């Protein structure tokens, strides 16, 4: 047999699809919809169930009431079925057959309402053994019981007295059970006939109903325990699922159609509830009589109450019996039923069952776990109850959920979970979560103003570890803030501070000096302190830095002191490197060594001057007597003050015409340098570096200042420490660094670390180019043997092992790399980056800088990055290095369209040929300001042109001529300037602009087409399709001209 669909079976049986679906659910077969298919065995089981439920034929639910007759063969055979004689205790727990569902016990107690009349005797004689009436709150049995016992079901305990025979014609008021007359007016059930069933006090150890096991079916149509739910009455007398006479089907009408009185509770006049086919008595396992507890207020006979008779709940008195402890229990005094819910009337409710029973019955309280929806005027069913209250009888809506839930399944208790008291930790976490800030829907930890220390170039992961947050959350926050970064990418300090402010943290960026100190402390190294006591300290020469404005004679002064000519070797006559020299002079018939450091005076070398002031003991400020105080003079003065070093002023060029040393003294007084002759403490010396005048006086002033205000001592026996003044890449010697030893003694063979470079000292040269084996404090030397070119201004120190030197250098390199990446950063927000690049609004000039010394490269890079020609163009330094231009530089420039700048270096080997072949622009410079000027011009050339409006002339309309071909033509008189053809114009009327961006398409003078009309002449102007012109209007013409970018 092929599979059939549910709706096809419903059409075949003449019932609705939902009736068939409900029957299938009661049989334990679950389908999703009316279009679902079912197997052939299920079809046969469904057919048998519907035939048994409809008196042996598959008829529609709304069939006429069947006449009393014999029960179906299956039903008639069931009471006579043999049962095992020995009752077992487990029989009360195992389902033997699906004779009946869970029932609610009845308890003694009065039932409110009119007393029912005694019922007539049943048509068929009762067996000799005493029988008991079905509990009034028992729900309809599952349809699976109609088809006989389920295979494998255990037999129940035998009942004494045998089975009750099926009594044809046994009904209520002569009507067969299975047909309901009217929804609103139910028949009187007090006239049901049958022998009085004595009630027992103890619960019957009966079998658990067969059918779907409780808890195994989360989609059952009954309560949430998995039991079949008794169907509540439907409005308008709609048939119930299962057909006429099916369990839980329509109720028969009372005698005479009168209103129901309250149902009897355990009185002798109670009749057994029919089960199965029409008129059939409910069979019991083994024919045993069911013990029944006394009903409350057990008056014999009577009508069952209806909503009209009981408009409100009784104010006092004991409640009718609630549900039994799961399944069909004895009638009790309102004791709560088990999770399975007490049986009962519509909605699974008992008669006013207490919590734990089904949903509300007659004015019932709320159903407990697994209970159904409210019934007649019932309160809401418990959570998870199926169906809810039915309309039409005042039933309140049932609990949440339409289909059954899983409460009570697998031994779990039903109903809402009880919420225990929260611990202090839970309450604290909830409180903190309430206060946690949210940025773009991302929850973040909230600080209370505590400080978070991060190094330069820190990533979001580093920040997240400090505050105990998730790095992915911080990435989401940055996306919401318009920054596209990853969790491990270095982020700028400003971005991290903004993020910290959002979460109420105070971010502290660790300075480079602090970072380096912490790094050295991790290796148990102290930098900047003299080891040993006072007995180990010896005098050292002073370190003097010569500072001042460009071209004021600093290098000439040093040449005079050293009796050399360094100026001749400097490109452009300006110093572009830091030079360190040591000279010996006689002061008061005593030889004294003085170390001089020459710093550049050009504005691009600010970092070099700061570095020179930081490593010096005394500063000589050179000021030209003819120029006076200049910008770089003030800057050098500020550097010296910041370094807290004493200053000796050398007023140079006193032999030049126009020199005025007094004027220089007066100008420097404004900056806090008061000469000794004016009552101050600053020594001023008038010199001429070119003529060699007063040089000895200057050296004497330096020595006196050092002796008077400085304690120049150091320990020469400790490991050397100092500063790298300059570094460069030599073709024959590799990386070379000029270092100034400040403490200790540097020897050949020592392992040293200079910034991110390290290595063993292979050789040392002094300022005269001679090899030396060791260098003491305040001695400048040239060091060979480093792995790479260190940065100018980096500290150096000697360590014991090569491994320690390598680890320190690698960590410094990683730190500097992160800092550079963060400094470069993301210059555009996430929202406008793509649009700006597509529209060409942002352009970048990529540069590769190579130089002869690290200080020069640093100065050039900083100067180029300070160029500001607008927001449309930006400079990006792809690479910088010391040494000649190599092939790798050309390859990098080829892939990135970069310009290579060689500062005092040339392309090496085949690099020049490759650059010419690839079309890479390589520019060579020897003077720094020339490079800056050319790059600035290139940046301005990349700018998009700016246009400005230039007015050409105005014309007044004297007459308007109409032309069928051209429209309106204005006869004008040019008042000022000139009017040209194909230029833009605007129309002005009474001082207000009427139209913009008009085009002068036609221009005539008399009958001739002309290109322009000058001031004072008349002509005709055609404005194209624009015809709204009047006399006395003014036509102003203009054009857009490119504006030079400055």
Swiss-Prot record:
Enumerate the spans annotated as tr-type G domain. 539-711
Query: What family does this belong to?
Result: Belongs to the TRAFAC class translation factor GTPase superfamily. Classic translation factor GTPase family. IF-2 subfamily.
Task: Provide the species name.
Answer: Streptomyces avermitilis (strain ATCC 31267 / DSM 46492 / JCM 5070 / NBRC 14893 / NCIMB 12804 / NRRL 8165 / MA-4680)
Q: Which GO terms describe its molecular function?
A: GTP binding; GTPase activity; translation initiation factor activity
Q: Where is the composition biased (Basic residues)?
A: 418-427
Region annotated G4, chain positions? 652-655
Annotated segments matching region G2: 573-577
Q: Which spans does this entry mark as compositional bias, Basic and acidic residues?
A: 177-194
**Pfam families listed in its UniProt record:** EF-G_D2, GTP_EFTU, IF-2, IF2_N
* UniProt region (Disordered), positions on chain: 49-450
This chain's protein is named: Translation initiation factor IF-2
The segments labelled G5 in the record are 688-690
Low complexity: which segments have biased composition?
A: 57-80, 89-106, 129-169, 195-214, 302-318
- InterPro entries associated with the record: EF-G-like_DII, IF2_II, IF2_N, P-loop_NTPase, Small_GTP-bd, T_Tr_GTP-bd_dom, TF_IF2_bacterial-like, TIF_IF2
What SUPFAM superfamilies does the entry give? Initiation factor IF2/eIF5b, domain 3, P-loop containing nucleoside triphosphate hydrolases, Translation proteins
Q: What is the lineage of its organism?
A: Bacteria, Bacillati, Actinomycetota, Actinomycetes, Kitasatosporales
| Biased segments, Gly residues type | 239-248, 266-280, 319-414
